[in-house]
């Protein structure tokens, strides 16, 4: 449009010059020439009118194009305002994300504290397990000693029983009245034992009822807990859904639609701008001063840009150093993990060896149980022999009564000579009886020793069972320790993998930065090429300007348009300054984030060091436990050797006793022969009368013999009662063994359940770790987005530099046009009239080309702004998604913490249940049973709370020796 106006003015100047020439020709030339000139001027006027019409049409077209370009510029301004608002929203979201990251770090710190407390608890449990293993081993040794002593006592009792049987077979004559007394004694002992047994059964049933009631209460409480946990989970899921809906709603309803009022405001602004076009020409000089100020500010911005680039280089160097440090730390961790794996393998081998030893011990116990069964069978046989001996004793008593009657008859017929022989024989019998009494005393002492040894064997058996339980608990705790170490190894491996992934990400970032640097260099080279092209175009335009010297008025219009463009560019510069300030703030935030990441890396290093120390301490404790176990094994082996020696000694003693028993049998046989000879002599002397003195002496001797027989019978009853008590102890030990086996099975099932729960916990922890890993990846993606924003900032700076170059070019054009105007004013225009239309046509073409270039530039800027707007919207949506996912992660972590608390509570409840056997022992303390029986009953209860079958009814006839009579008063 400016060029057209300039051409119009040049045409008017040409008209004036032609008029002046015509006037000069009128005054100088003839009228003929005046007519020819008139015709020529008329033709020129017609041509000029046609040109004016064409110029007016072109002016209208150009005005319409200018209006369209102005509208597009207003649209661009609105788009830029929206982009600034979106950038502010993004800035706010970044602040929120930083706050959320801080909260997440605090949560991770609390989680690490909880894990440390769990490790401490596990160590305490390991120490308790070690103590229990020691006690179990001691109890095992005691049980073994008791078992061996019981075997020796049983053998001694068998020997004593044989001795007594032989003595009873020697005693022939006694009263038949003693039969009923012995049966009464035997029957008297059995109902007392039955009553005590019934009382213990009643107490056991009451205790089991209480335990079952407590189990029902615990199950009800667990059901209530499960219901409350399900309600909490449902509410948490509803909260997560509401948060996601709110985030999507905020993301969708952030940009309100434009209204018709905005369009009306735009039309008003357009009218106002059209009115102020003429007034803005005067303010060109002021704008030039402003342009100078802007140049200074741009130089300052470029200096700041250089400083920022220097800071970025420093940060890259710091990153290189950090990567090297992380690589060193990863290598150390790899070495430590290998060392821990070797240690784990050693511990597993030790564990397998301990299992083998326990299997061997179980086999030995089974062998001992088989021996006990054999001994029980032998005892039953001995009892049968006792019954036979009792019948023989009764027969002997009847024979003694007959002998007394015969003696009374013989007293009347025996002589003094026979009496003297009988006296000598009776003295011999007395001596033999005294020897038998001494042997009985020795046997009583041996019986008391056997009783003491039986008590010791029972105590040793109880200690052995306790040691077995402690060993089993220690093995289980060792399994738990091995599993904990394996989980720690897995965690260390995961951490090493995470560090390797961080290294890979850092390498990728370095590659991206290097690619960005290469792209920047390429862009610089392309910018230099564009500069050269622009210089060429400038040269061409200068040539054109030389040709357009006559278009001074057109240049003035161009100045006005340039002032308008300068004002617009100033507005754009202001907006770019705002963008620069915002991006500087973003850079500062990114630096703060980098500092926070460095602090996190240091914290992770400290945590890794702490974990290493904890692992070393645990390994030391395990080594100490191993040494203690080895020492205990050595002590157990020494105790076993001593018990074997004792067993050999007891066997020797038994052999000696057997020899003594054989000797006593021989002496009894001799006495029997003597008695037979005495009976024959009495029969021979029956015919002869015996004096009163000999008769009285014989009566005395028979009374002493009867007393000796009664004492022997009492000793026999004591021996039978002791054998019965030993049999009861054996039955109780067998029942105790069965109960212990049931408890061991229950413990194994409980351990399996606990292992399953631990596996579930490990799965939950792995899921939480994966979610944390995904969240870290998302944080890295956010960092990459920050880097992209930095790149966009750099590209914006480059765009500003390009605009500065365009401003400089426009200013140079302005100065050149001013100089041309001054030159035109000084020099007179002596151009011919004919070539004017050609120059005007050339001006039109150049103006059209310039307008096309401006339109293309405007379209390119519009497309670039639209792309930026789309990118910003996508970033906003992505940030909304990240917030939703972060809330979901937070909820998942809270849920996992609740589940961990629940599992802790369940473990504490199980520990409390494990304390119930002690309570049961206190309840059953005041029982009337023997001390060994009390301990066995308390141990038989266990902590499982499972009712066991009552003891089987014993056939008392086997032990009492009473026949199953239908009509007797004793049945």
From Swiss-Prot:
GO biological process: cytoskeleton organization; gene expression; protein localization; protein-containing complex assembly; regulation of protein localization; spermatid development; spermatogenesis
InterPro entries: PMF1-bd
Signal peptide: none
Alphabetical keyword list: Cell projection, Cilium, Coiled coil, Flagellum
GO CC terms: cytoplasm; outer dense fiber; sperm flagellum; sperm head; sperm head-tail coupling apparatus
Record bears the keyword Transmembrane helix: no
Coiled-coil segments on the chain, per record: 37-69, 117-229, 282-325, 355-680, 706-827, 879-916
Protein task: Required for normal spermatogenesis. It functions as a scaffold protein that attaches the sperm head-tail connecting piece to the nuclear envelope, thus maintaining sperm head and tail integrity. May also be involved in the general organization of cellular cytoskeleton.
Protein known as: Polyamine-modulated factor 1-binding protein 1
